[in-house]
């Protein structure tokens, strides 16, 4: 047996060696440039049979290139390359020879045409050896990979067509090195990246780029192009149509369809008097049609459909001398000349469907048209049409103040004492329902006088739309006056807040949404933030309560948030604030206060500011006293009690949170948290005002932070303190709010856990907090105190709580407990039974 096996093994080795010898392929790097060294290597690797005779050396080089290419072909169903054998390369299928341009006595390979051969393979670097190649057509095959750099040697290239294949990578810049190139067709591949501006500096007659993955703006050098046909269709080009387009005197056809282009049409389009096809459909163009459009004297096909164009389609556009087809459907035109009505134009094809035209069939519903038609884009101020403002980018959405991702904002745990200024991170009160409530002043309940020196809210800081950026760092407000949450009021996301749901998005009705091209709601953008508000719905639990929650607490909390900053979860909560959004009825309160105390704590103080802005201001005062408690936030929860006492100032707002439960409540919002993210902006929703306080996101950080962090870190105590803050202004409101909070606490059975001992800390300050008027009652607002107790369920939920972040209650609940807190240890009796579902479940009539 051994001998037969040994013989078999030897035979196997011999056969393998023979196959390898015949199958030896050039070892050229795939994308190598064809330097002289590599050329020499190519000749040595691709040894030519000495028996083959060639008319000249150029045909020999072509033979080497074509044989290397044949080896790079994996599938040839039509046997197109089957006869690529022997030295007569001019007889190969798809290969064309002609006299050399520099020496007509020499025959060279001048062209390759393998169109529609369904060949699969790639392009080897050896193709660079065919230096006399002027025509290269391989469209409608299955070639893949990249266009090798070695093709830069093809200096005579005149037509390069690789369309309808599977090429990838960046724009093939080798094409920029061909001085004689006139026809460039890259259609239907997978090229990506930006379009080099140099492409329009070349003397090209046709540029086909459609159906790839290019994503960039259209270079302004397009005006230098002498091309007669240019197609950008079905890519991801964005921005404006360059105004230099008016300089393209040779242009006959230009196609922009299926991109993300925006803004108004530049007036220079009217200078294209030789254009026969102008297609700008399926983009995001806005505004009215420029009057210069009547300058398209040669246009035969004009397609502006599926955009967001408005205004009146005038008679002169529909009576262009050579016009055969004019499509302006799926826009927001609200008027058209009689000559533009389909069927009344002597056989011309007009399409006006899905607009806002009266007495015409198949139009958009009125509620979808109204938002767009009532606020048309002023193209005189649009950068795309020459204005200075830049309307092209559809009005920038109100800065999203990055929903102040509270969590990350690492609240700069402001040293409780110092931070007196609750420079709540300027959380954009995006949702801040009606952040305007600069009324914060109300929050600035002087009550903060609470000995804890509720963080001076610097008189409810006028919600300055503080830049959300800061939101993270809530510089702890000085306990003085209920934290004057300088909420960065993102104010006027406020709108969205009040009707969180409505706020969400542009309103389904928003024409933009309706219009196929939803991409760019140029005008509506601002609403975008609103959109977030809607998400709060989850938090909706007990929407009414939210309003109370919103009360000032948020500001106060801002300081505590720092403590929480550590726990990212709070950020999550930020969304909960949206929950508060439900309260829209009393939008103001919900917005501000809720966000801060609950979840937001993590966001750190940032949110707190927003709370103030909300109308809640009054409630805040009552809570503000609690702030003292909050001050503790910086300290770890374990110390909270003590800290609270010391840091009360910061905590002032904390009092509200003191009911840590609220923080837990926030957890309840957890559901809201899910929606939170979307909702963050709209704290309005019941879910704890936390989010509502536009700063919602920020509030989230602030209010809850303490609690949430408490879970994460002992710092809970600070959290509690924040609760008081909420009481800030109107103790009465606060008390109301508390009720919600308590309810919320109940619903969020989780609450129990949240509060951790730290909550107690608020107690010391609780009175101050409560008293927005000194009287702690407001602060405690019996219900809230209950809430606090529920939180007692200590840390267990903590982790979860942070996620809930909503804890709308937090802000408000503190009041009652605050009274208890005054004792210093009001370990919230764990209402384990209750789920802190959207904290603000407590629903006050009218909210």
Swiss-Prot record:
Matches recorded under SUPFAM superfamilies: L domain-like (SSF52058)
Bias type Pro residues, positions: 485-499, 533-642, 838-847
Start-end of Polar residues biased regions: 667-682, 688-720, 726-752
Domain of life: Eukaryota
Transmembrane parts of this sequence: none
Tissue: Expressed in flowers, stamen, pollen, and pollinated carpels (at protein level).
Chain positions carrying an annotated carbohydrate: 260, 274
InterPro entries: Leu-rich_rpt, LRR_dom_sf, LRR_extensin-like_regulator, LRR_N_plant-typ
Signal peptide: 1-20
Key words, A-Z: Cell wall, Cell wall biogenesis/degradation, Glycoprotein, Hydroxylation, Leucine-rich repeat, Repeat, Secreted, Signal
Pfam families registered for this protein in UniProt: LRR_1 (PF00560), LRRNT_2 (PF08263)
Disulfide bond entries: none
Purpose of the protein: Modulates cell morphogenesis by regulating cell wall formation and assembly, and/or growth polarization.
The protein's name: Pollen-specific leucine-rich repeat extensin-like protein 2
Lineage start: Eukaryota, Viridiplantae, Streptophyta, Embryophyta, Tracheophyta
Gene name of the record: PEX2
